[in-house]
Amino acid sequence: MPPLAWADDRAAAEAYAQGQGVLFLTPHMGCFEITAQALALRFGAQHGQLTVLYRPARLSALNEVMALARNRPGLQAVPTTLAGVRQMIKALRAGEAVGLLPDQVPPEGMGQWAPYFGKPAYTMTLAARLALQTGAKVVLIWGERLPWGGGYRLHTQPLGHELSPNLETAVVQINQAMETMVLACPQQYLLGYDRYKAPRKDA
């Protein structure tokens, strides 16, 4: 694994200490894959595994291979199915952590249209639902790519305010939090990801 450094892990440590479950949110920015591995290394032994989602392969025979590739000590990958969502809820209620990319465009019927940088974007409701249903603490995190192969620097911060109990408003608040993160270091935003695409219909 490439070198990892933490700019600040205080938000994560304080959220774990409250024992209510932690929901880590990261946009398509920097190296989002490294954030899950870094969290598992830093907090897994003390606070239990981090649960993340993966989209199952079209060829079912590949799913076991994909799961084995993603799973490692302190990290569990679950499919983007109802069973996977249930595992995430179970983990949060047990005081463990879950990681999500809330700017991932969900399948049709699993999101709502909400503003993102001034344009309507189909936005998942899952992140807001998980936080509201379980009382999990929301922490923002991203993995900064360091120059010249120097590894990664992890940044965490609290959401900064309570999510609205209204789901639609909470989804907008999460989009706003993602915007703030991107604006802090826009050169590391993955512009190749089509945030404004129409949702797929194969939910």
Model-identified regions with their sequence ranges:
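Non-catalytic C-terminal accessory region of glycerolipid acyltransferases
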Residues: 16-17, 41, 82-203
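Residues immediately flanking
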Residues: 9, 26, 104
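A conditional alpha-helix N-cap/helix-loop micro-motif detector
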Residues: 2-6, 59, 78-82, 120-121, ...
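Residues in well-ordered beta-strands of folded domains
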Residues: 7, 53, 157
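Catalytic core of membrane glycerolipid acyltransferases/transacylases, capturing the structured
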Residues: 20-82, 108-115
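A short, well-structured juxtamembrane/interface segment
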Residues: 1-22, 30
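Well-ordered alpha-helical segments embedded in enzymatic catalytic cores
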Residues: 11, 34, 84-87
